[in-house]
Structure formats: structure tokens, C-alpha cells
């Protein structure tokens, strides 16, 4: 008989680091060209006028200006779009 209890094993004990996704600049905020507006996985928010999209779907400003969000109606559902109005 064992005098000590065996340690056993578990399949838990792992977690990934947070990816800091979300909106970084809100509507009405002034931004400079290259500023990151939204970090996202997939295109939950679409790029509008003066907004570029990175290969990881990050949206960023192409010009200096003011951020504004708008809702656009598609055939199946409503989508959000972010634009930058030049100053």
C-alpha cells in the first residue's frame, strides 16, 4: 500500500492570453492617419470611406479626421460601418 497519495493528472490548466480586441477610437474622436480604429476577428464592422482594412481585419484611418459610425442595411441584416471624415 502507498503511504502517499499519487498526484494524478488533469487535462485542464491552460488559457490563452487576451487579444485586446474591440473599438479603440469612438465616434467623434479626432484621429491621425494610421490610427487603429477597431481590432476584430472577422468583419463585424465594415470599413467605410477613408478607412483601410489590415490582413487581420483591423480597421485603421487612411487620413487625418473625425471618426463616425453608421448603420447600413443589407438584404439580410444591418451592418455597422466606420468612416473617417477629413478635417
UniProtKB/Swiss-Prot annotation:
> Record's SUPFAM superfamilies?
Ribosomal L27 protein-like
Annotated region Disordered: the residues are 1-25
* Keyword annotations: Ribonucleoprotein, Ribosomal protein
- Please list the GO biological process terms of this entry: translation
| Pfam families assigned to the protein according to its UniProt record, in alphabetical order | Ribosomal_L27
GO-annotated cellular components: cytosolic large ribosomal subunit
One GO MF term attached to the UniProt entry: structural constituent of ribosome
Family as reported in the entry's similarity comment? Belongs to the bacterial ribosomal protein bL27 family.
User: Under which name does UniProt file this protein?
Assistant: Large ribosomal subunit protein bL27
Q: Which organism is it from?
A: Synechococcus sp. (strain RCC307)
Q: Which gene encodes it?
A: rpmA
